[in-house]
Amino acid sequence: MNTSVLNVNGITFTIYDSYTPQVIYMIIADRLNTTTRMVWFPEFVSTVSDDAPRSGVHSAVDMYMYIRDMVSPSNADGPRSLSDAVQMVKSWVDRDPESNTKFVEHCIIDAYTSNREVNDDVDAQTCVLLDAIITQDVTGNDIHGPEYYREVVRSFRDRCMEHSRNIAANKRLVPMYVTMYSNWSNTTAPTMANMDVEAIRGKYTVYVPEPDERPTVILFNDLVMSEDLVVFAKYGEWLKYDARHPPTADTALSAMSRRTGTKVNNRERNHIALFMVRRGIYSPGMTYDIAHVYPAPGVGYTISVLSNNAPTVDVPRSITTAMGLGGDGIEVSDAGGGVTYTASFVLNDITFVTEYLQHFTLMKCTNKATCIFIDETHLMRHAKEWRRFTISSPRFIYEYNNYTVRFSVTVESTRRDVARVAPYSRIRIYDAPNTNVLYGIANDITSHMIQYKSEELDILKFYTEHLHTDELLNINVRVLRDSKRVKRTPGQLAGQHRQVRRRIQAQRDGDHVDVRSIINVNNYARQCAKLPTVVRSVDLVPDGKEHITFSPGRGLPDVYLYCNHDDAPYPGLAANRLAGNSDEHPFLPCCYRVRRNAAADACDNDSLAPEVRSQTFYNTQRVLPLTAFGKCPGNLEAMLAVQRYCRSTDTNSATFYPKEKVVQGATAVRGAVQVGPNAAIEAVMRAVHCLQSSTADPRSLVIGAEQLERERSKMMEYITCAGQELFDMSSGERLSWLKDNTSYFDPLRLVKLLQYHFDTNVFLYVRGSTVKPVRSIAKTESQRVRLKFYDDYTQAWNDNEDVLSIPYHYAGADYHDMKIHERSVVLYVHSGTEITTLAHPHVEYVLFENHCYITDTIRKTYQALLPQPMRAVYSFVYFDVDDATEEELDVDTANALRAIYYVSKGKQLSAHWRDVAVANSDKTAPRSQTIDGVGRLIGMDGVQLETIRSVEPLPSLPIDNHHHSMFSFHDNMNRRELLNPEHSAKCTYTWYLSKLTRVLLHLTAYTILKKGTLMSELFTVDERRFNLLHDTINSLFEAGVVDRASYMNLLIVEQDRVLTDSVDTARRLVYNASLLLRRMSAYETSEIRKSRYITELLRYETDFTSDESPFSIVTSIDKFILKPRPKTVSLFRPPLSLKHDDTNTVLVQYSVDKHYLSRRVDDAELMRLSDAMRSNTFKEISFDMFDTLYGNGDDADVRERERTSPTLILHVWRNETSSWTVLECTDDVDSEYAGVYFHLNAADPKDRITLKRLTLC
């Protein structure tokens, strides 16, 4: 490599050929303590001052100071010699004309506006100099004139002043673009300014000695600014720097007021609250972006750019937002008696929707002061905001400093007539209580975005470790959730549980019947679990069975009772403790394990009443006393398949399980808890006590009301964990509810408090829910879990209408917290039996014989309900609105569009508008769509939608282009191309292929990236089957349907799992993909390449989702890979035909709206037409038509008029292999009948029409 030597003040540097001039300048500037904007000129430049840095025959000139001095009125010598100045400046401008010309102009304008009043006249020399530099004309001719430059300076200054006022009002809040590098020079200190804005030009790195934890990076925009404008502020105090002398870090901070500094550990922390950068000059088409300011060791703050896909707009007001008080565009409302504020801003990164919100709603912010939840009361909204229709805009709840504020996020795009269209995210904040909260939430949302960007790899690692993706690959479960998504009132759940009651109809006659046939007592089984059997004669008592005589009263004869129970063979009497029947039946017969004194005549008085013993096990669903256990609900045992998994000799000896004989036949029991509002807390405490050792009997644990109140108060620090379940309550209401010890502690809504407070997994089991009960859990060969449900949904379940349930909230958020606790408890929520009267639902705990094993099975079941991706919640459909129209998209149409959009992706949808359900019926769902020449949707059901532009066609909706009035034709050729029936088939192919492309791109990710680890573990089909898709994907790439850059961006944005439920599904996908591509001709593929919607469709909506699992592709291939339109379909009735009249004269007849325009054809013309038909070549026949118009074809209403119609040109084409002929009829230029078609039917129906092969003129 060639080198040269450069001597700078006695130091020799080696210069390589690869060094750019900029690098050489930096080397010299570093040695001579100059900046990189200093330009080195030969010594012949006489205007350079003597104290300028020199190196050999060159001297360094600071162009900024040099040009400012030339036009500065404070210069005693006046401007420099024009010839010298132009020669020197022009030689420097020639090095980089585009950037250096702007720099020179900025220097002159800055000098002029800094040292002169705006009303001063621009002197002639300044005009000549500006002309010479800007026009590159050294002759000095005044081209523009003083007035031109005076307006330039005045507008520049006016815009700066307006910008200052807007910043002071905190209006026009948008992120902006920044790029900064190099260092500051140690120069003089800055000066203070009061809300004034001027530029620091140059590219610098910000140095601050003490890093701020989270600098605010919300940036303000300006319509026209200088090259690089930077403003630093500390709590509203603005600093103005002299651009010639940028300050050091110490001097910059010392100039700021210290009264607003905060102290942490007796150290004052310096905060830089705002900074602003604008790159560009005099261009209304601005570029915005998010800039990230982060602390760096030894440097202070470094500024970097997060992304650069910001929109460019041609009208600044279309992107400018309003934020603050007063002025235009500010929304101030009076909600609930107080003034609230609403504002919006944009983030030019759509990752905010797909990744950021998903992450922060899943994390639930357990240890943070601010949390994000989903507002389930605003799941669908339709509004015309910011001149755009936003059909799907769920709201989120943000908790900030004990305030609950709602915000929404929508994906929007700029106006359709802008050259560069890019989507961005708009955040709208609703009903903030004050401006501090308004600005604080905006700051925090942006800061969270930055946090996510900076910790993206750590977050991905966290999900990989905690979400147990290996266990979720093949799960297909029904989501079981509480059907009532409303705040419960006391006794409401108990009332619901008692709605369905199956009463036992006892038999009234016969032998060997139940004792309840002769004793009419309600809820007999509640007191006696083992009921005796009745016979009329003592001879009917089975041998070996003891019996007693019983008098049923009411004049009935005595009967004999015996017990048909092996574990309770002895009949006896017990005092009747059931309310309402004790007078008629003071004693009730029952079966016991031991003999009792149960003679009927021995029970005449209370002193001889049988002894009442303490019962330790109950077979009914009554509320248990503290000294007893109860039978576990039958459905819970069936669901867990306890006969299969629990009847094992390998029980868990380290966990308590009751050893009483009465419990021997049960593999799961429920434990007793005191009745009260804090029963859920006590149930967890007793269950956790059981898990400590095999001797830790929970019945021995003494828990008082004061202890429960203390535990409840301790949970207040975890209240944010339950924020999603309590989305409909403000932070103050949540705290008040938790502080009130008399209010019901609802485990359905506060389960996460129990989990984090007691460090245990809590699984809820509710009796009385109306969802389909679970029958069992089955394990696959790969040890995954599948749930089975009872087929008979309507059958009666007695008191055991039980389901495994999760707290109610929107399906987009997850139930299971990120932390997997070592211990697990199961809570049983019920309301006792029919006669139980409770103020609140009762909560008990469930113990299993093999507790650890069973709860682990339940945990895997709950993991099947783990978080669905936020993109399943968010499928944005956005429509840009034309400014000139006043038409609004009606609600039915909007909901119908969204319904069709979802149904086309295999999703189930229930649309809501103002709390009124809109069914997906034929009344609201469009039946057809009309698309224009570039594949955009312009009409529905034959009605043009003026208010929407650039809308994606709906793949599942038929295309109908018969409605010609919707189209605006620029020329006749455009009309013929649009009305070509092939066009509909091509557009259909486009949308089928685009959806197919998305799936194939996902499914081949493992093949393309098989050497990496990004997607390799996220598929259930092996490499061999993926290799079968190579040819299909390669054909897509080669055809240009999608490029590899878009494909990689798709992977980066999506990072989604696309799975197949079976090998058959994967094979069917490969087959349909290959079949669809084989059906497409090369011409059709080339047409699809022209569609600009292909890459736009590669977005965030997950295809092939189902109710059971959003991660599985389940037999939904047929929903989008349909058979293409038959090529024999003709969208238009032939308006032109050949026919014979009554005189056997041939007519050429043209029909328009049932009016027939015809002309008789003479023999010569008929012969000429027949010859053309018999020919194998393409021929053209033209003739004038002098016609008679027949009204409705009725001779009685003949109304003749003569006119000269356009010359018709018949293009006749004969199929070389068939006997049929296709004709195309066109006309001369600009005829109203242009572009119509007709055909002559073939003799054989199978040989009719092939429009695909028709060659158009």
UniProtKB/Swiss-Prot annotation:
It is found in: Virion. Keywords: Virion. This is Putative structural protein ORF146. It comes from the Viruses. One of its GO terms (cellular component) is virion component. InterPro entries: DUF5757 (IPR043920). Belongs to the ascovirus HvAV ORF146 family.
